[in-house]
């Protein structure tokens, strides 16, 4: 007999339909799985065989052929255990599947219990788009799957409860759409940071325009503390943005079972020992890397010169294109990676170069060599470079309260609303992503501004890319100032954010 069971697969962060076809015929007992299965899918034969027997069903002593269609696409993971098991039971006549169009995903243990799998949300959204009426997933994935509104989602504990549901003896109840409750924790606040008003202003500009920023300063000056508070002034995520981020984290297996929706801008801070595939994504079965896990959020690289140069170079494509592409023999996958790059570093090996205390003992050659670990093309992609000096005693003991994140965030949201209206109907989300055409349209300069930019270009030896980034930052400063046109003071502030020299002089 022949049976077909609906299931789903993953390509990047998008799901697609997979049909599990099972054909049982007379002949020498054999169990073949075709349709480009990987090792985990092939091993499903033994898991399914044991689960069927341990759940009280009879495993067919026949020739069994399973095809995972489309046969030309590689199938990976353990999520096909459940549809394979149901296909065998249906083809052998031991179980009658529902007539309505349903999809099944889940790993099956040897005793017949269902275990969670990764990537459930993108597959659930695909199931809804394809036209499935019901989706059956392991219990631990049911809240995540319920985020796909418009399809009935059932959480299944084991094969026996699923069989009872099909027979009508004990129907399962569909899971209601999960809604987020109260936030689990407060984000770190800028009111905790003493002084450093210039750095705070630079981070406000960066947040308002989505600009990349580099913080340079001695140990203990507050670089990491400032960077970790950046998410607290970023605008709220839209529903579409939250779902997009959640899909990426679902594929990476990083979602909480109790709180499956990513509702805040991500903040990722990998260690400097991370490899290039760990940063960009990769593996034999590609998975998202840190640049994708930081999508719509912040990627913080502390101690920037300590990262391997080849690791940092993989940032160039996602910083320019907002997407990272991973090519393998089995195919190519792309992951979105539109993030704010926030970097922090010391000005030399000991960390005290240029400090008025005179504690630095590094030679000029040593300083230049240390700073030279960062390539020019990568620095060109950083919009704002700001110095974070060490604090003196009077600044540390200042009693005046610092401005809270909520106040800064209101200004950032106002600037982002201006940009949202400006770029409505285009793929651009913020000033940092302006195309050359949009720059000509929205970054027109008066003769006074042009003169100021000309002087900065000549004096600072700016590249064409650096010139464009100064203009983008100036446009953001104008938005924060509620100015429809870029003024000389906006240019002056934007140029100030490029004056710190990373050449050890």
Regions found by a protein language model. Name each.
Residues 1-214, 218-224, 327, 466-467, ...:
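Peripheral, non-AAA+ core regions of ATP-driven protein-machinery
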Residues 18-24, 279, 383-386:
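Short beta-strand elements
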Residues 34-45, 58-60, 67-77, 286, ...:
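Basic, amphipathic alpha-helical bundle interface domains used for macromolecular binding and assembly
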Residues 215-256:
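Walker A/P-loop
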Residues 217, 281, 303:
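The Walker A (P-loop) glycine that initiates the GxxxxGKT/S ATP-binding motif of P-loop NTPases
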Residues 215, 301, 344:
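Hydrophobic anchor at the beta1->P-loop junction of P-loop NTPases
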Residues 204, 261, 266, 273-299, ...:
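Conserved alpha-helical scaffold flanking the Walker A/P-loop in AAA+ ATPase domains
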Residues 296, 302-303, 314:
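Walker B catalytic acidic pair
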